[in-house]
C-alpha cells in the first residue's frame, strides 16, 4: 500500500518510492492527529440532538447519529447525515446551542446536498421576528443575511443534487465564502460590526420560520467555529461521514487507522472540497468523470489530478504544438513515456506526439491534430481541458471517431503489456473533464479585479450557456472512444437513466482471447441481436497483472442463449452520441391524457400591435342578451357651449324614481371650489384583479432605491385561460444537418406545424436543453395504458404552492437603483362597482359644461322595471311597421288588470287575407320617417266565418306591404267568451286612442291571486297622464276582457289639478267588471287600401318573467358642483338620541348667602312637548321599612308596562338640615308632562336657600370648564294653562339618586307659606315644630339645585308634581357616524310619517333613436315625439312594504322652564310612501340620500323652456341635522340596550349617575352589537360588571375570548365566589397532616392556579365541610385579584372521587369586574 509511488514496468514498487511513500504516510498520520487536536467549534447538529461529536472522525459504524431520542417531524438520520423533508421544523432558543457572546470573527462550516430547488434558509437566528443571521440558498445564489443590513450575495448554487461543502467567514467589515478547501472569494459588501446575539434569540434549522419554505435535502455537517483561520483550510474540519458522502475523499486528514475506502463510486462527482484537486474541480458539476483508479494487489489507490493549465500555456494549445506542454509550474513534469524507471513522486502528464509504441504512432498524431483544430480558444479567464477543445468542432467527431477509438484502444492495450498504463492515464484525465454546466460562472462569485490573476485558480474557456448544449455529446463521444474496459472501479450509486443507444448489428464471433482484467460496469445499451454461443475461453491468469490478449476478429452471431438470472442493476450509462435524425415515424395511437404539466415560464411579451383600421359601421343587430360591461368609450370632443336657455316653468313634482343608469362621461368641468367634507363612505368590496398587461420594454438599470418595507402577501391569482392554438404551418423539406450554431436569443413559442410524413424510427437523442414552455394543449382522449417507463430525470420545480401564511418580517434587501419612468400601462378593466357610498353635501354650483357630442348607439340594455308616469308628452306620429316577429310561446295568463275607461270605437279595417309567413329578414337600417298616410275608406265588415281547425305553423313568409286603413265597420255585438286560443302572430300596432274620461273610484277590491307571467309584449307609447284623482281604495281584480278595437288617438287633454292624497284603504272585495263604453261616432270613410297581410290580433300573452337586473354601470365621473339647494322643510321629529357621556365633575361651589323666597313668576309660553324623560327624583320618603331580599332582575322587554296607579301623598317628613351643594349634575331628558299631583300636606317651613345667580344659557358645546354664574334673569310671563293631558305611558325606571351629605343643623325659621315640594334632602335632625303661618305670596320658581352626591338606594317615592314644560333647546351639532348595528328585532308599528318632499322635474333629453326598453330612469320632462310602440303587458301589483322600525331614542334636550301642561295635539299628517323593498334599519345614508337626491335637478344643466323654482328645504335639513345630532348623542351616551350597548357597566354609571341595578347589555370591543352580551350591572357596588355563568353548577360563562379579553383590559379588579357543597367530604382548605385536607386547586382564565398556601391563595369565607355529620355543608372561596385576566375560575382541579357516602357539587356565582 504505497501512496503515489512510482512503479517499474513490471509493476513493482521501486525502493526509493517505498521510502518516500512511508514518509508521506507518516506525515499524513501526524497531520490527522494535529487536526484532531485542534478546536473543532460548535457542532450545531450535535447540539440539536441530531448527531454526536464523535461522528467527526469516527469510523463509518459510529458515524450514524444516534436515534435513541425521538426525532422531530420530517427529520431522518442516515449515514450521510440528517435528511430534512418539507415538513421538518426545528427551532430552539439560541442560548441552548450557541454562546450569547459569540462575536466576530467566526466561520460557518457546512456540508449538504439539496434535493429540491427553492429559496429556503439553511438556518436563521431571529430575535422578535427580526433576522439577525441567516444563510439562504437561492436557486443560483447563496445569500448571507446579517442583522437586517445589506446581505452578501454569492453566485454559488447548491441546488444540483450534488454534495457541497463550503465555509462562510464573517469578519468586522466583510463576509467571505470559501469553497474547494480554501479558494477564497471576497465579498466587496461592507457591513457594520456585528454585535453579540441577544439571549432571547431563536435558532431555526432548515427555514427562516415555520411559515416559510423549508430546506429539503441532507445536511452532513453544520459547525460554527469561533475563528476566521479555519476557513482557509476548512477541509481539515470536515467530518468523516461527510468525506464518505459520495465524494469527499481528501488525503490531508486520513486517520492512521483507516486508509481510503476501496468502495468509491466510480461515477461519483469529484469533490468540491480540496484545493489540490485538478482542473475538474472547476469544470465538473454533473458528477460524470472517469476516476483515476488502477487496480494492483487488490488495493485501490487514488491519484491526485494536478493538471492545471495556466494562461501562458494556452497559447501552445492554440498554435497546435501540443507535444511539449510544460506543466512544471504546477508540479507536473513532462516525461517520456518510454522510460525504465523514474523515482519522481508526481505522475506526469504528457500530451505529446511521442510514440506510445512504434506501431501506434498514428493515434497521438490524430489526437494532437484534433486538439490543434481549435481556433477559438481565447486567453480570458478560461479553463482548458481535453474535452473542452472538442466544443468548437462537433462536426469533426464522426470523422475521427473510428480511427481514434481503435488506435487509442490499441495504445492502451499495448501499454498494458509493457506496464505503461500509468503514463497513459494523464492523457485520459485531460481528455475527460467537461466544462461546467452551472448556471453561474464556475459556481462561485469571482470578484477578481480586472487584470488580476490567481495562481491557484483555473479559467474556463467557455463559461456561458452556449457550451452546455454540447457537453453531453462530447463527453459521451470520448467515453465511447475510450471504453474503460480495463479500469474497473467499485460500483457507484445509481444515476438517472441515460437515453437508450441504437441496437448494434450482430458481428461474427471472435476468437477466444485471454482473460483480461475485469472492467467497470458498462453502459446499459440496447439489447443486440442474439449471437451464437461462443466456445468457452481459457481461464485467465490470476496472480499478478495479466497480459491482455490481442483483440480477436469479430465472431459470428451466436444463437440465443437461455434467459439468465436477472443481473444487478447497472450503473448509469453515459449518454450516447446523438444519432442522425430519423425519418418521421408513423403516428402512434393517442396516449392517455397526461397529468397537467407544470406551468410554463412566463413568456416574453410580444410587441404591441398597431391598432387596426376602423371598420365600417354594421347593421344594428337584434337585441342580444345583456353582455358584460364593456370598456369605457373614448371621450367625445367637447361641443360648443350653448346659450343659456330660458328658465322654464315649474313642473309637477314627480315621484322619486329608481336610480337611473350612469350616463356617459362628460367633459371635465372647471375645477370647483373645495366643498365641505362628505360623510365617510362605506368600505367598498375588493374588485377582481385585472389582467396583467403586456410587459414593457426592459429599461436600463436604475439607481439603487431605498429598501421598501415588506409588502403584504398578495392573494393567489386566478388561473388564466388557455390561449388559442396557432395555425399549423406547412411541412418543410428535410434539410441537411448543419453545424450547430450558438444559441440565439430566446424566441417566442412558434405555431405548431402540420404533421409531416412519418419517418423511420431514429435513435433516441441525448436530453436537450430545457425548452420553452408550450401552450397548454387541449386534453386528448384516453389512450391505452402504455408500458411502464424508465425512471425519469428529476422534473422541473413544481408549480407554486398554495398561498402561505403571513411570513415574519424578512431582512432588509439591498437598495435598488431608481428605475426610469415606465410607459403608462394600458387601461385596466373596470373593477366591480363598490357599494354605494354616502352622498356628499351639495357643493357650490359649478360652471355649466359644454354639451358633448352624441355618443355611438350602445347595445340594447335589458328591460328595466316600470318607471313612474312622466309628464304628458305630445302626440307622436305612428312609427314604421317593424318586421313580424315569431310566434311566442304560450305564456301563463297574466293577472287581470283594473278595467280602464272605454275609449271610442275605432274604425275596423278589412281583414286581409293571411299570407304565408316569410322568413325574417335581417334588420334594416333605420329609415327616415315617412309621411302620414291618408285615412282609408271604411270597408264592409265581412261575415264571421266558422272557426277552423288550427293549422300547423307554416314557413315564415315575406313581410307584406302595409295596407291602407279600411273603412270603419259597425261594431258587432260582443260574442261569447271563447276558449283562449294559442297566441297568434303579433298584429300591427294601432294608433293611440283618445284620452278616456276619468273613471270613478271603484270599490275596494280583494287582492287577486297572482297569475302566471305572460309573454313580454312590445313596449307601447307612453300614455297621457290623467287628472290625479283622490286615492281610492284598491278595487277588486276584474276578469280579463276581450281585447277591444284600438281607438283613434284623442286630443291632448289639459293638465289636471293635483288631488289630495287619500288615506290608504284596506283591500276591498272583488269588484264587478265595468260597463261597456258608449259607442263612438262614425268616422269618415278612409280610402280603401290594398289588402294587407296583417295577422290576426292574438290574445294577450302571459306576463313575462321579470328580467334579471342588468349589471350595475360603472360609476360616472364626478359631475360639476351643483347649485346650493333650497332649504329643506322642517323634518319630522327624529327618534330620541342616546344618552351623552358624562362631563367632568365640577368643583364644589362656595356656599352662597341665604336668599329670600322669590315671588312666583308668571308662567312662560307653552313649550314644545318634550321627549319622554327619565323618572324624576324620588319624593319624600316614608319611614324606612325593613330591607327586603334582593329580587331577581326583571325580563328585558321593549314594551313598556301600563302606567301604575296614582299614589297617595306621603306623610310629611321631618325637616332635614340643608346639605351643601353637591356636584353639578347633568341635565336630564325633558319629561313628558305628567298628571298634576294632588296637593300635599303643608310641610314644615324650610330655611331660605342660598340665592344663586342666574347662569347664561349657552349653546351645547364640548365639555368645558364650569362657567361663572350669571346675573339673575327676569321671570317669564305666565303661560296659558294647558288642558288636562292624557295619562302618559309609564317611563323607564330612573336610576336611584344618591343621598346627600348631612348638612349642619338649620336655624329655626319663621313659618313660611306652603312651598312646592322640595328636592329630597338627607335625613335631618328633628326640628322644632313651627306655628302655622299665614299663606304667603306665591314665590317664583327657584333654580334647580345641584344634585347631591349619590346616596344609598332609597325607597320608591311618591310621584312629584309635573314640571312646567320647558322651551325647546338649541339644536345640537352634527355628530359622527356611529358604528354599524345589528338588525334589531321587529319594532312596533310606527306612526305615519310626515309627507316627504316632492322631487324636481327632470330636464328634457335629446331625441334619440328608437331602441329597446331601457332601465327606467327618473321621470323627465316632455320629450320630443317618439315612435309609436306596441302596448306592453300589465305589470304586477307591487307588494306593500313592511312598516319601518322605531328609531333610536332622541337626544336629551336642555332643561326648559317649567310650563303648564299643554293640550293634546292633533294627529299629524300622513307620512310619505315608503321606499321600495324591505328596509331593515334606517341609517344615516337614507336621510342624507333622500335629501340630496331631492336636489338632483339642481345639478343638471339648464335647458330652455324649463323653469325650476327652489323649494324651501330648511325644515328637512334641520330634521336631518337633528337626527344626526341625536345619533351622535346616542353613541356618546349608551343606554345599555342591545341596540345601544355600553362597553362596561361603569360607562353607564359615568354617563347617568342615577341608574339602578339590573340587567344591561354591554359590548366591550365596541364592534357590531351582534356580539353584545347581557350582564348584571351592580351600580350599588360602584358599577360592577357581573357575568353570570351559563349554569350555577358549571364554570362556563358563554363569553368569547375576544370580548373577555377586552373586558379584562377595561377593568382593574375582579371578584369571583365559588361554593363547594359537600357531604361527608374532608376539609378543603387545610394541607396540614393533622387533618384529611385536600390540596385542591382552582384554574383561572389565564391558566394560573389558585391554591392554598400560595401567592394565589383564595380567601376562604367559610369551610363547614369539616363537619361530617351526614348533612350537607359548604365551603365558600372568594377570589379577588387586581389582575382581571386571572378570573373567572374555569376549572376546579384535584377533586376527590365521588363515593356513595361522599358527595359534593359546585356552585359558581357571577364573576364581577370593576
Swiss-Prot record:
Its main location: secreted. Residues 141-217 form the Laminin G-like domain. Residues 487-1481 are annotated as: Disordered. SUPFAM superfamilies: Concanavalin A-like lectins/glucanases. Residues 1256-1266 have a biased composition (Basic and acidic residues). It comes from the Eukaryota. Residues 1-35 form the signal peptide. Keywords: Collagen, Extracellular matrix, Glycoprotein, Repeat, Secreted, Signal. Residues 496-505, 893-902, 1466-1476 have a biased composition (Pro residues). Residues 1515-1714 form the Fibrillar collagen NC1 domain. GO terms for cellular component: basement membrane; collagen trimer; collagen-containing extracellular matrix; endoplasmic reticulum lumen; extracellular region; extracellular space. InterPro entries: Collagen (IPR008160), Collagen_superfamily (IPR050149), ConA-like_dom_sf (IPR013320), Fib_collagen_C (IPR000885), TSPN-like_N (IPR048287). Residues 487-542, 552-611, 660-719, 741-797, 798-857, 858-887, 888-947, 948-1007, 1011-1052, 1053-1112, 1116-1170, 1172-1196, 1201-1249, 1252-1306, 1309-1353, 1354-1413, 1420-1479 form the Collagen-like domain. It is found in: Secreted, Extracellular space, Extracellular matrix. Residues 1035-1044, 1065-1074, 1318-1327 have a biased composition (Gly residues). Pfam families: COLFI, Collagen. Glycans are attached at residues 155, 321, 376. Residues 574-587, 685-701, 985-1019, 1132-1145, 1174-1186, 1271-1293 have a biased composition (Low complexity). One of its GO terms (molecular function) is extracellular matrix structural constituent conferring tensile strength. Coiled coil: none annotated. Belongs to the fibrillar collagen family. May participate in regulating type I collagen fibrillogenesis at specific anatomical locations during fetal development. PANTHER family: COLLAGEN ALPHA, COLLAGEN TRIPLE HELIX REPEAT. This is Collagen alpha-1(XXIV) chain. The gene is COL24A1.
Amino acid at each position: 500500500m504505497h501512496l503515489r509511488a512510482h512503479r517499474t514496468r513490471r509493476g513493482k514498487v521501486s525502493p526509493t518510492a517505498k521510502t518516500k511513500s512511508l514518509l508521506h504516510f507518516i506525515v499524513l498520520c501526524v497531520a490527522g492527529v494535529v487536526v484532531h487536536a485542534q478546536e473543532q467549534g460548535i457542532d450545531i447538529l450535535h447540539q440539536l440532538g441530531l448527531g454526536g461529536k464523535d461522528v467527526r472522525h469516527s469510523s463509518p459504524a459510529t458515524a450514524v447519529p444516534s436515534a435513541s431520542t425521538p426525532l422531530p417531524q420530517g427529520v431522518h438520520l442516515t449515514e450521510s447525515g440528517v435528511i430534512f423533508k418539507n415538513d421538518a421544523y426545528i427551532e430552539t432558543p439560541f442560548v441552548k446551542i450557541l454562546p450569547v457572546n459569540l462575536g466576530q470573527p467566526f466561520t460557518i462550516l457546512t456540508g449538504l446536498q439539496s434535493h429540491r430547488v427553492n429559496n429556503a434558509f439553511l438556518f436563521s437566528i431571529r430575535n422578535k421576528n427580526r433576522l439577525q443571521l441567516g444563510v439562504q440558498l437561492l436557486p443560483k445564489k447563496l445569500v448571507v443575511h446579517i442583522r437586517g443590513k445589506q446581505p452578501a450575495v454569492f453566485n454559488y448554487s447548491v441546488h444540483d443534487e450534488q454534495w457541497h461543502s463550503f465555509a462562510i467567514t464573517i469578519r468586522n467589515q466583510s463576509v467571505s465564502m470559501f469553497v474547494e478547501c480554501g479558494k477564497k472569494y471576497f465579498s466587496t459588501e461592507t457591513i457594520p460590526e456585528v454585535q453579540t446575539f441577544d439571549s432571547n434569540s431563536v435558532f431555526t434549522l432548515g427555514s427562516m420560520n415555520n411559515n416559510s419554505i423549508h430546506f429539503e435535502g441532507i445536511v452532513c455537517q453544520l459547525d460554527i467555529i469561533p475563528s476566521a483561520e479555519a476557513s482557509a483550510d476548512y477541509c481539515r474540519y470536515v467530518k468523516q461521514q461527510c468525506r464518505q458522502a459520495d465524494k469527499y475523499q481528501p488525503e490531508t486528514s486520513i486517520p492512521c487507522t483507516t486508509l481510503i475506502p476501496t468502495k468509491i463510486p466510480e461515477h461519483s462527482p469529484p469533490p468540491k472540497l480540496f484545493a489540490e484537486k485538478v482542473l475538474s474541480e472547476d469544470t465538473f458539476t454533473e458528477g460524470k468523470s472517469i476516476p483515476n483508479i488502477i487496480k494492483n494487489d487488490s488495493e485501490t489507490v487514488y491519484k491526485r489530478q494536478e493538471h492545471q493549465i495556466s494562461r501562458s500555456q494556452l497559447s501552445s494549445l492554440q498554435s497546435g504544438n501540443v507535444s511539449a506542454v510544460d506543466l512544471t509550474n504546477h508540479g507536473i513534469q513532462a516525461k517520456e513515456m518510454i522510460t525504465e524507471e523514474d523515482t519522481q513522486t508526481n505522475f506526469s502528464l504528457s500530451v505529446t506526439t511521442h510514440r506510445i509504441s512504434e506501431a501506434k504512432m498514428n493515434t497521438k498524431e490524430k489526437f494532437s491534430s484534433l486538439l490543434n483544430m481549435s481556433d477559438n480558444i481565447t486567453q480570458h479567464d478560461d479553463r482548458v481541458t481535453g474535452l473542452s477543445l472538442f466544443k468548437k468542432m462537433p462536426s469533426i467527431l464522426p470523422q475521427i471517431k473510428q480511427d481514434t477509438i481503435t488506435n487509442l484502444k490499441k495504445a492502451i492495450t499495448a501499454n498494458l503489456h509493457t506496464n505503461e498504463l500509468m503514463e497513459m492515464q494523464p492523457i485520459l484525465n485531460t481528455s475527460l473533464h467537461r466544462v461546467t454546466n452551472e448556471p453561474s460562472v464556475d459556481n462561485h462569485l469571482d470578484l477578481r479585479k480586472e487584470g488580476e490573476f490567481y495562481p491557484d485558480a483555473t479559467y474556463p474557456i467557455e463559461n456561458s450557456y452556449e457550451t452546455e448544449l454540447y457537453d453531453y455529446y462530447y463527453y459521451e463521444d470520448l467515453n465511447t472512444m475510450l471504453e474503460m474496459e480495463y479500469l474497473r472501479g467499485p460500483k457507484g450509486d445509481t444515476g438517472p437513466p441515460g437515453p437508450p443507444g441504437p441496437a448494434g448489428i450482430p458481428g461474427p464471433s471472435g476468437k477466444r482471447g485471454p482473460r483480461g482484467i475485469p472492467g467497470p460496469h458498462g453502459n446499459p445499451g440496447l439489447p443486440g441481436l442474439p449471437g451464437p454461443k461462443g466456445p468457452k475461453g481459457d481461464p485467465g491468469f490470476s496472480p499478478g497483472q495479466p497480459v491482455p490478449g490481442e483483440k480477436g476478429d469479430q465472431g459470428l452471431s451466436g444463437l440465443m442463449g437461455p434467459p439468465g438470472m436477472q443481473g444487478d442493476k447497472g450503473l448509469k450509462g453515459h449518454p450516447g452520441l446523438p444519432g442522425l435524425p430519423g425519418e418521421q415515424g408513423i403516428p402512434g395511437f393517442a396516449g392517455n391524457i397526461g397529468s397537467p404539466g407544470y406551468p410554463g415560464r412566463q413568456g416574453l411579451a410580444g410587441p404591441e400591435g398597431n391598432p387596426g383600421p376602423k371598420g365600417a359601421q354594421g347593421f344594428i343587430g337584434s337585441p342580444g342578451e345583456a353582455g358584460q360591461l364593456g370598456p369605457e368609450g373614448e371621450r367625445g370632443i367637447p361641443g360648443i357651449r350653448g346659450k343659456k336657455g330660458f328658465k322654464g316653468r315649474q313642473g309637477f313634482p314627480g315621484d322619486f324614481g329608481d336610480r337611473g343608469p350612469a350616463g356617459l362621461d362628460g367633459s371635465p368641468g372647471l375645477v370647483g371650489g373645495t366643498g365641505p367634507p362628505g360623510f365617510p363612505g362605506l368600505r367598498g368590496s375588493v374588485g377582481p384583479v385585472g389582467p396583467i398587461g403586456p410587459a414593457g420594454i426592459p429599461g436600463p438599470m436604475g439607481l439603487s432605491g431605498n429598501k421598501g418595507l415588506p409588502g403584504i402577501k398578495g392573494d393567489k391569482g386566478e388561473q388564466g385561460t388557455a390561449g388559442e392554438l396557432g395555425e399549423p404551418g406547412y411541412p418543410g423539406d428535410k434539410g441537411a444537418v448543419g453545424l450547430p450554431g450558438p444559441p440565439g436569443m430566446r424566441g417566442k413559442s412558434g405555431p405548431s406545424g402540420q404533421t409531416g410524413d412519418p419517418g423511420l424510427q431514429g435513435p433516441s437523442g441525448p436530453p436537450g436543453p430545457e425548452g420553452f414552455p408550450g401552450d397548454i394543449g387541449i386534453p386528448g382522449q384516453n389512450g391505452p395504458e402504455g408500458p411502464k417507463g424508465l425512471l425519469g430525470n428529476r422534473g422541473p420545480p413544481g408549480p407554486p404552492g398554495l398561498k402561505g401564511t403571513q411570513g415574519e418580517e424578512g431582512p432588509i434587501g439591498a437598495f435598488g437603483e431608481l428605475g426610469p419612468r415606465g410607459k403608462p400601462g394600458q387601461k385596466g378593466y373596470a373593477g366591480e362597482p363598490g357599494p354605494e357610498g354616502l352622498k356628499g353635501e351639495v357643493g357650490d354650483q359649478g360652471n355649466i359644461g359644454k354639451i358633448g357630442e352624441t355618443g355611438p348607439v350602445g347595445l340594447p340594455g335589458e328591460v328595466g322595471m316600470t318607471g313612474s308616469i312622466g309628464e304628458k308628452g305630445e302626440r307622436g306620429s305612428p312609427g314604421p311597421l317593424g318586421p313580424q316577429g315569431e310566434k311566442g310561446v304560450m305564456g301563463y295568463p297574466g293577472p287581470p288588470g283594473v278595467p280602464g275607461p272605454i275609449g271610442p270605437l275605432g274604425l275596423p279595417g278589412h281583414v286581409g287575407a293571411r299570407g304565408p309567413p316569410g322568413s325574417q329578414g335581417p334588420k334594416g337600417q333605420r329609415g327616415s320617417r315617412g309621411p302620414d298616410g291618408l285615412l282609408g275608406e271604411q270597408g264592409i265588415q265581412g261575415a264571421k266565418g266558422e272557426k277552423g281547425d288550427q293549422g300547423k305553423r307554416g314557413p315564415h313568409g315575406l313581410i307584406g306591404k302595409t295596407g291602407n286603413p279600411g273603412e270603419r265597420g259597425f261594431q258587432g255585438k260582443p260574442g261569447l267568451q271563447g276558449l283562449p286560443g294559442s297566441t297568434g302572430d303579433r298584429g300591427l300596432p294601432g294608433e293611440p286612442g283618445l284620452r278616456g274620461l276619468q273613471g270613478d273610484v271603484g270599490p275596494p277590491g280583494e287582492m287577486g291571486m297572482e297569475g302566471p307571467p305572460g309573454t313580454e309584449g312590445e313596449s307601447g307609447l307612453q300614455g297621457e297622464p290623467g287628472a290625479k284623482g283622490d286615492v281610492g281604495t284598491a278595487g277588486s281584480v276584474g276578469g280579463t276582457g276581450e281585447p277591444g278595437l284600438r281607438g283613434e288617438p284623442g286630443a291632448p287633454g289639459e293638465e289636471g289639478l293635483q288631488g289630495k292624497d287619500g288615506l290608504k284603504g284596506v283591500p276591498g272585495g272583488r269588484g264587478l267588471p265595468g260597463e261597456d263604453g258608449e259607442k263612438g261616432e262614425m268616422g269618415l270613410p278612409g280610402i280603401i287600401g290594398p289588402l294587407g297581410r296583417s295577422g290576426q290580433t292574438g290574445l294577450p300573452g302571459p306576463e313575462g318573467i321579470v328580467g334579471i337586473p342588468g349589471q350595475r354601470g360603472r360609476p360616472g365621473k364626478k359631475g360639476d358642483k351643483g347649485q346650493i339647494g333650497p332649504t329643506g322643510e322642517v323634518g319630522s321629529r327624529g327618534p330620541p338620541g342616546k344618552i351623552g357621556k358624562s362631563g367632568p365633575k365640577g368643583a364644589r361651589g362656595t356656599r352662597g348667602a341665604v336668599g329670600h323666597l322669590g315671588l312666583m313668576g308668571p308662567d312662560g309660553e307653552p313649550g314644545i312637548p318634550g321627549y319622554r324623560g327619565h323618572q324624576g327624583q324620588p319624593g319624600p320618603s316614608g319611614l324606612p321599612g325593613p330591607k327586603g331580599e334582593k329580587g331577581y332582575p326583571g325580563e328585558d322587554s321593549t314594551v313598556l308596562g301600563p302606567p301604575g296607579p296614582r299614589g297617595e301623598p306621603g306623610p310629611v317628613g321631618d325637616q332635614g338640615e340643608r346639605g351643601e351643594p353637591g356636584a353639578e349634575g347633568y341635565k336630564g331628558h325633558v319629561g313628558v308632562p305628567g298628571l298634576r299631583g294632588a296637593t300635599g300636606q303643608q310641610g314644615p317651613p324650610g330655611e331660605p336657600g342660598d340665592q344663586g345667580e342666574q347662569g347664561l344659557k349657552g349653546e351645547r358645546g364640548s365639555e368645558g370648564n364650569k362657567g361663572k354664574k350669571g346675573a339673575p334673569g327676569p321671570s317669564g310671563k305666565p303661560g296659558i294653562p294647558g288642558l288636562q293631558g292624557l295619562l302618559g305611558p309609564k317611563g323607564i325606571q330612573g336610576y336611584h339618586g344618591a343621598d346627600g351629605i348631612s348638612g349642619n343643623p338649620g336655624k329655626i325659621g319663621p313659618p313660611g307659606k306652603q312651598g312646592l315640594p322640595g328636592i329630597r334632602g338627607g335625613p335631618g335632625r328633628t326640628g322644632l315644630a313651627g306655628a302655622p303661618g299665614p299663606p304667603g305670596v306665591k314665590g317664583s320658581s327657584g333654580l334647580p339645585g345641584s344634585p347631591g352626591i349619590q346616596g344609598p338606594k332609597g325607597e320608591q317615592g311618591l310621584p312629584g308634581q309635573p314640571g312646567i314644560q320647558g322651551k325647546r333647546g338649541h339644536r345640537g351639532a352634527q355628530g359622527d357616524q356611529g358604528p354599524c348595528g345589528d338588525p334589531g328585532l321587529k319594532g312596533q308599528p310606527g306612526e305615519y310619517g310626515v309627507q316627504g318632499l316632492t322631487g324636481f322635474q327632470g330636464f328634457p333629453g335629446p331625441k334619440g333613436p328608437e331602441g329597446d326598453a331601457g332601465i327606467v330612469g327618473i321621470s323627465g320632462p316632455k320629450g320630443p315625439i317618439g315612435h309609436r310602440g306596441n302596448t306592453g303587458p300589465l305589470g304586477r301589483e307591487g307588494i306593500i312594504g313592511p312598516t319601518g322600525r322605531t328609531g333610536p331614542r332622541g337626544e336629551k334636550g336642555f332643561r326648559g322652564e317649567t310650563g303648564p301642561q299643554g293640550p293634546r295635539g292633533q294627529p299629524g299628517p300622513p307620512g310619505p310612501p315608503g321606499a321600495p323593498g324591505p328596509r331593515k334599519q334606517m341609517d344615516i345614508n337614507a336621510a342624507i340620500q333622500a335629501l340630496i337626491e331631492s336636489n338632483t335637478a339642481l345639478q343638471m344643466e339648464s335647458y330652455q323652456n324649463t323653469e325650476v323654482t327652489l323649494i324651501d328645504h330648511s325644515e328637512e335639513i334641520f330634521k336631518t341635522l337633528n337626527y344626526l345630532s341625536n345619533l351622535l348623542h346616542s353613541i356618546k351616551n349608551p343606554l345599555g340596550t342591545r341596540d345601544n350597548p355600553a362597553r362596561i357597566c361603569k360607562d353607564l354609571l359615568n354617563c347617568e349617575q342615577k341608574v339602578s341595578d339590573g340587567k344591561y347589555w354591554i359590548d366591550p370591543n365596541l364592534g357590531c352589537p351582534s356580539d353584545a352580551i347581557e350582564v348584571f350591572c351592580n351600580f350599588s357596588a360602584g358599577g360592577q360588571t357581573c357575568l353570570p355563568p351559563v349554569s350555577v353548577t358549571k364554570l362556563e360563562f358563554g363569553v368569547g375570548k375576544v370580548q373577555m379579553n377586552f373586558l379584562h383590559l377595561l377593568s382593574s379588579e375582579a371578584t369571583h365566589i365559588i361554593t363547594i357543597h359537600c357531604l361527608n367530604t374532608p376539609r378543603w382548605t387545610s394541607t396540614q397532616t393533622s387533618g384529611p385536607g385536600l390540596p385542591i386547586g382552582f384554574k383561572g382564565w389565564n391558566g394560573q392556579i389558585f391554591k392554598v398556601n400560595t401567592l394565589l391563595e383564595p380567601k376562604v369565607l367559610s369551610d363547614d365541610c369539616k363537619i361530617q355529620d351526614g348533612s350537607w355543608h359548604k365551603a365558600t372561596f372568594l377570589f379577588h385579584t387586581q389582575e382581571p385576566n386571572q378570573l373567572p375560575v374555569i376549572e376546579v382541579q384535584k377533586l376527590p372521587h365521588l363515593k356513595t357516602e361522599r358527595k359534593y357539587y359546585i356552585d359558581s356565582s357571577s364573576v364581577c369586574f370593576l
